[in-house]
């Protein structure tokens, strides 16, 4: 269940009580299933929902002018993506599944409701985003200053930390 995966993920960032758990478990959304190697989002696409990953892996990436891809991050169970739909409707990146993926598609209005119902949840989601930004800063250093071996090692350690 996507809601349980989300609870596991955000529980790392805040001490949630039973009421917070209930708010998460009552999120209204539509189940979504995508096969392996499926483009879920194309850059420039109009966005209409936040997706919570239940099972599977995906990559968020940007396509460079010469056709190469720059992977921005890996999306794992419990991750949410496309929170920018809360303030902007067009995606500035693409998302493609690495494995088959199951998720929960949540309308922006429903996600805003969730944020207004619990200060702890708002803090947990904010802290989750702060951690993602920290990961992206590390990626900038990794790509700019580390050798290929160091980049791969750091990336694998980051994945290991997130999968646990």
PLM region spans:
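Cyclic nucleotide-binding regulatory module and flanking cytosolic helices
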Residues: 1-36, 80-81, 86
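Cyclic nucleotide-binding regulatory domains
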Residues: 12, 38-100
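Residue-level recognition of specific faces of alpha-helices
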Residues: 23, 49, 71-74, 94, ...
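A generic structural signal for short hydrophobic patches within well-formed alpha-helices
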Residues: 80, 111-112
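Conserved active-site beta-strand element of glycosyltransferases/polysaccharide synthases
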Residues: 104
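Polybasic "coupling" helices that flank or enter modular domains
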Residues: 116-164
């Amino acid at each position: 269940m996507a809601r349980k995966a989300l609870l596991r993920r955000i529980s790392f960032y805040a001490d949630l009580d039973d009421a917070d758990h209930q708010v998460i478990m009552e999120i209204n959304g539509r189940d979504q299933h995508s096969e392996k190697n499926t483009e879920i989002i194309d850059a420039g696409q109009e966005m209409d929902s936040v997706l919570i990953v239940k099972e599977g892996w995906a990559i968020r990436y940007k396509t460079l002018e010469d056709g190469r891809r720059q992977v921005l991050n890996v999306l794992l169970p419990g991750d949410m993506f496309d929170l920018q739909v809360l303030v902007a409707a067009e995606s500035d990146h693409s998302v493609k599944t690495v494995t088959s993926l199951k998720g929960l598609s949540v309308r922006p209005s429903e996600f805003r409701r969730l944020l207004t119902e619990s200060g702890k949840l708002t803090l947990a989601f904010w802290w989750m985003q702060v951690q993602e930004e920290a990961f992206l800063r590390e990626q900038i250093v990794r790509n700019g200053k580390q050798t290929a071996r160091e980049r791969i090692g750091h990336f694998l350690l980051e994945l290991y930390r997130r999968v646990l």
